[in-house]
Amino acid sequence: MYKFFDRNGRILVLRPDMTVPVARMINTKLKDMDLPLKLFYTANVFRVHESLEGKRNEYLDCGIELIGGDGEIIDLEILVTALEVLKSLNTREDFKLEIGDVNILRSAINEMNLGEEDKENIIDLINKKSLINLKDYLENLKIKDEYKEFLNTLPWLFGGYDMIEKAKGLAFNNRVKENILYLEKIFLNLKELGYEKYISVDMSMVPRVNYYSGIIFKGYVTGIGSTVLKGGRYNDLLENFGRKSSAIGFSVDVNLLINSCNYDEKIDRKPILVEKDNYLIKLKEKIKKTRDDEYLEIVDRE
């Protein structure tokens, strides 16, 4: 992050993303509004990257946040919206939405009675996919062999549905298994909705920020070496600003996504309504109806 000091010695930071500012606004300017609440934004954000990475440190961020909604239905709504954003702007359909859940790795590590430093080091090695160093690090820890096998194997489990099956075979307690089963349910529902070729899983996905609390995801487009879309659930963040509420959202790097756009086709926007009862069947039917020549827009349910 870019950090500065004001004349009183206080640390000032250029915003690295918009999620935290939105969480703060929910507890100030919007504190009297009823939930659930849907927001969108466009703003410049600033991040410091390693030198020679070829990445910009300032870019245009565009995103949505759903405040006050939790559970499978809401997670699916946001994931479908993310998929349709990528699909509408990339008619070649050479993109992937990679999905994970922070609770899979988090619940496993919390079971191992490790110190905070060891936890952070393990997560950092997994995040960097530094698997040889991870194996060496685990060898020096006094933990069960099944724990070591889980941590050494999980980073290799990325791809299609079969990776979920393999992860279930490694689960060493009910909490870990429950988190894997939830991700499986999300994957199968997206498959049922017709998105299987656009999605993959990463069973060890770890975000760079620590406020995520559940489903997380990243969008990639062929030929672009960076993530163009990212998001997830952050149920605990708003409580830091005074108002406890569940939340989920995502943002896109506008500049990167524009590079993947195909403007040859004019798209008519057609909103669809999805009721809560039998939502999956109804959503699937309406997606099929709009699949060929119309744009899918998810709007508020009654």
What kind of region is each of these model predictions?
Residues 2-4, 113, 217-221:
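Short beta-strand elements
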Residues 97-101, 300-301:
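Acidic carboxylate-rich catalytic motifs and surrounding loops in phosphoryl-/glycosyl-chemistry enzymes
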Residues 93-97, 108-112, 123-125, 138-140, ...:
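A short, ordered amphipathic alpha-helix with a cationic face
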Residues 9, 17-32, 39-92, 139-302:
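Positively charged, Gly/Ser-enriched RNA/tRNA-binding surfaces
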Residues 102-136:
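Short terminal or interdomain "cap/linker" segment that borders an active site or interface and mediates
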Residues 1-14:
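Short, structured active-site "lid" loops
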Residues 14, 100, 252:
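A conserved hydrophobic position in a structured secondary element of the catalytic/binding core
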Residues 58-62, 99-107:
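Short, conserved phosphate-binding/catalytic loop or strand-edge motifs used
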